[in-house]
Amino acid sequence: MDTIKIFNHGEFDTIRNELVNLLKVVKWNTINSNVTVSSTDTIDISDCIREILYKQFKNVRNIEVSSDISFIKYNRFNDTTITDDNMGYYLVIYLNRTKSLKTLIYPTLETVISSSDDIMFSKSLNFRFENTKREYKLVMCSISLIYKPSICRIQYDNNKYIDISDSQEGNNLCYCVITMDPHHLIDLETMCVLVDKSGKCLLVNEFYIRFRKNHIYNSFVDICMDHIFELPNTKELFTLCNDDGRNIAWDNDKLESGNNTWIPKTDDEYMFLSKLMNIAKFNNTKFDYYVLVGDTDPCTVFTFKVTKYYININYE
C-alpha cells in the first residue's frame, strides 16, 4: 500500500460495536491519554481486522495485526509513539464516526492530510489527533504487511492490472510452461496450460502458438493421455501417476475441489493471455521437475520441466 490508506466506506463497521463493548470494561487512567488492552477478546477482534484488510489489499502475502489494542483519550497534541513494536503501520478506527473527530498526518513539513474516516498509515509519519470533544475515543493497533513477490504486472482490462507472481499464496490460477524431456512416445517439446486450484487444466498453447478452442481437462495426466502421446488408445496400454501424489502446479494443501475453471471469452482476456505468453516465453530460467510414471514393465518415466506463473483472477 501507499504510506496512507483511508477507509471511507465503513469497512470496519462490523467490529465497531465490539470495540465499543470492550471499551466498557476498560479501566481508564485519568492521567494517561490512552490505555492498551490485550486479551482473548482483542485477539478475536484482531482476527476480524485481519480478514477485513485481506479484502482491501489484493497483493499481500501475509497480514499481522497486533493483539494489543490501544484506546485513545483525546489529546490534540498527542504525536508520540502509541505502540512499541516492529510493525510498520498504525490502524486508527473511530468508535464514533463523527466528522468533528480528525487524524492529522504530515507526509512532509509543508503537507497535512486530515481525515475523519478510519485510516491506516506508516509509523514513519508524524501525526496527531484533533477534536474539541474530549469524550470521544478511538482505537489504534499495529499492522504488518508482507507483499507477494511479483514478477511483473499485466494489464487485464482498461482499469485493472494483474500481478504475475511466483508465489501460490493468494492466487487461484497457475500458468505452467511445460517442457518435455525427449521420449519416443512424445513428439512435442513445449506446451502451456492454466491450472486452477482443483487441478483442472486449460490447454493454452503449444510451441507458444495459442489454441483457439478452449479445451478443459480434469488433470494434467488427462492432457498427457489424451493429447501429447503419439499412440492411439493410450489408456488401454498403461496408466500414469506421480509417485509422490503431487499436483503439477499446486501444493496439496492449496488444492480445492469444485472450482470452476477460468475460460477466456472477451478480447481483453485473450489479450491478457497473449501478454502472459510473451512474458513466459522470455522468462523461464526457473523451473521445477515433475515426473509421471507409467505402470508398464519396466515402468515408463516421463520427465517435465515446469515454470510456474501464479495469478489471481476473479471469475467465479
Curated annotation (Swiss-Prot):
Entry keyword annotation includes Transferase: no
Cystine residue pairs: none
N-terminal signal peptide: none
Induction: Expressed in the early phase of the viral replicative cycle.
Record key words, sorted: Early protein, Host cytoplasm, Host nucleus
Gene Ontology cellular component list: host cell cytoplasm; host cell nucleus
Domain of life: Viruses
Subcellular location: Host cytoplasm; Host nucleus
Family: Belongs to the poxviridae OPG031 family.
Stated role: Plays a role in the inhibition of host NF-kappa-B activation. Mechanistically, blocks the subunit p65/RELA translocation into the host nucleus.
This protein's name: protein OPG031
